[in-house]
């Protein structure tokens, strides 16, 4: 999260996004085209600091939303029309700097991986069974603890390979975003992330995997990058080797969240409020 809302970050990231997309070596056609004009729903009441979203399986037509540092340890249930339905407290955990979210199988993962000042000694990924309509409080939470081999890093995106269960962590503020891996099975105490590669751009703020695990979206402030599995590649392989293509994206005030729809019919984005007067939920449907 960027509490000071430095608009230069967004501007330079946008320029980098355009430059990266201009390389023909880094593009691939998407099998199913995506609408360039998204649907837009005003979020009511406003969610100020959305940092991760996931499209619900237990409650079709709804998204789970988390906010980052300085906000309660809770889930926000948001319907596809932009209405906040309820808030669900999560017991036994702290929101130090929650920065991304993923729904894998029936487990909802919350990534406490942000570290703007790069001073943290360890980081946390919480997971628990996806809530249902009758859930008022989440209490049975598991945690994956990890550290980096070379000190502290600020990360705002992660992906979980549904086949290997390995977790890929993507840093934000390195010159080029670096990719670290947590290898499954995870130790109950401390895990060490291993550097496995770099992306060709910086300022990654969110990432999402399609329901079938064959597509990934990596988000910066100014762009959405689409990766597609070839043959039977692992997520790590097709993310690091590419190629990739820029997806349609309406620039948001401080957009830090992306997720595929649970039916794989498109993707959602949701921004922090930043300096804007309102927040909108965007959906880009496949044609």
Tell me the role of every PLM-derived stretch.
Residues 22-287:
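Sequence/structural signature of beta-propeller domains
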Residues 1-34:
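Bacterial Sec-dependent N-terminal signal peptides
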């Amino acid at each position: 999260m960027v509490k000071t809302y430095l608009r230069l970050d967004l501007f330079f990231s946008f320029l980098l996004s355009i430059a990266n997309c201009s390389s023909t070596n880094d593009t691939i056609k998407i099998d199913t085209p995506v609408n360039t004009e998204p649907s837009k729903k005003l979020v009511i009441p406003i969610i100020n600091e959305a940092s991760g979203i996931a499209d619900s399986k237990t409650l079709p037509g709804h998204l789970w939303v988390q906010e980052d540092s300085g906000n309660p340890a809770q889930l926000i249930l948001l319907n596809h029309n932009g209405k906040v339905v309820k808030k669900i407290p999560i017991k036994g955990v702290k929101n130090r700097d929650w920065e991304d979210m993923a729904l894998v199988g029936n487990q909802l993962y919350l990534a406490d991986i942000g570290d703007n000042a790069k001073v943290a000694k360890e980081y946390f990924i919480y997971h628990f069974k996806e809530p249902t309509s009758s859930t008022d409080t989440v209490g049975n939470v598991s945690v994956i603890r990890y550290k980096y081999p070379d000190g502290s890093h600020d990360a705002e995106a992660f992906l979980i390979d549904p086949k290997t269960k390995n977790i890929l962590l993507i840093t934000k503020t390195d010159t080029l975003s670096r990719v670290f891996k947590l290898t499954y099975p995870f130790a109950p105490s401390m895990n060490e992330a291993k550097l496995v590669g770099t992306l060709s751009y910086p300022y990654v703020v969110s990432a999402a995997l399609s329901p079938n695990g064959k597509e990934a979206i990596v988000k910066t402030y100014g762009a959405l990058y689409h990766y597609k599995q070839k043959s039977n590649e692992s997520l790590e392989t097709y993310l690091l080797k590419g190629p990739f293509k820029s997806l349609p994206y309406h620039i948001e005030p401080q957009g830090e969240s992306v997720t595929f729809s649970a039916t794989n019919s498109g993707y959602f984005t949701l921004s922090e409020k930043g300096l804007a007067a309102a927040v909108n939920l965007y959906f880009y449907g496949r044609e």
